[in-house]
Regions:
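Glycine-rich phosphate-binding loops that contact phosphosugars or nucleotide phosphates
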Residues: 1-121
Length: 121
């Protein structure tokens, strides 16, 4: 909204409760993001993942699916990265185990990343 520029494509994988419920019921909750990636992602895309713990099975599955599809991954997490540590192409690990503080840091970091992307268009 600050800059008058062309729109950029993006998709939030947790915004469709129908897709999440259907996938969770038929394939398991751990597949809710991986299945959507299989449908929509293509080589050259980037997947941004957010977790305060880094231990979410659905994010581990999403990283695996992204790798198979040639999709770059950027992981924002706390808790030393948890089980996701070392799996993403880019990791931004907030040095805290306090979920609220990690989420607050994620919001600031996301805005900073978006500003950098816009500055480099």
């Amino acid at each position: 909204y600050k800059n008058d520029r062309r729109a950029l494509p993006g998709l939030c994988l947790n915004s469709d409760p129908c897709a999440i419920t259907c996938t969770a019921n038929d394939f398991g909750f751990e597949k809710i993001f991986a299945r959507q990636l299989e449908a929509f992602a293509k080589r050259g895309d980037t997947l941004a993942l957010f977790s305060s713990s880094g231990n979410s099975p659905n994010l581990l599955e999403a990283i695996s699916a992204a790798k198979k599809l040639g999709v770059s991954t950027a992981m924002f997490c706390g808790n030393g990265g948890g089980k996701c540590a070392g799996l993403a192409d880019v990791e931004i690990i907030v040095p805290s185990n306090n979920g609220a503080r990690v989420q607050e840091a994620h919001e600031l970091l996301l805005h900073t990343v978006i500003e950098e992307i816009e500055a480099n268009l």
